Amino acid sequence: FRLFRFLVSLSSLSLTLFISGCVQSGNVFVAPNKVVLADQTPNTHFEQEVMITRIGQVLLVGKMSNEERATLHFERGVLYDSLGLWGLARYDFTQALSLQPKMASVYNYLGLYLLLEEDYDSALETFNAVFELDPSYDYTHLNRGLNFYYVERYNLAEDDLMKFYEADTKDPYRVLWLYLNEQKLKPQEAHANLVERAKGLSKDFWGTNIVQYYLGN
């Protein structure tokens, strides 16, 4: 996939450039693992597997409303996703939507899977659905921006990535995604804009080092 190859090339600078995440939910995973690699920490895996088992037991025997059942499917889907079990995650997300059709966070995950499959039209429709349900869903600006980037609609990508950046101008990863798109859209201005935006970054964020790398420092 072009998206995968692109992220791998970035990982030569940082294995977690995508750590800013593509997913926004109550317990945001997960975001670092969505597109790159599932976490390899054994203790974390064990805890996640225990939670998956417990949720499965509750779903089998528990009496609950559709909303509660949808929430459990979503939470188990997030756990599967964090383990790299995307087929199982997708099943749970689909179940959640069948029970609770207005879960914006589920559409965001499904949109990411479609993006990875290079089904850009369907991914765009799914990300648009997120905004219809929750206009404040921040990370979908990144996801939809990436979708536009890969179909070379850089002007539309700029709109989304700029909104994503403006939501937190101290986040180096937001600065980087905006810069990468501007290299395509307005290459004469991209470097100067990166220099200016880098001034607002905190040295407390490791990702600031990646920005400095792009600046040649």
Show which residues each predicted segment covers.
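Canonical tetratricopeptide repeat
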Residues: 75, 108-109, 143, 177
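Register position in tetratricopeptide repeats
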Residues: 82, 116-117, 150-151, 184
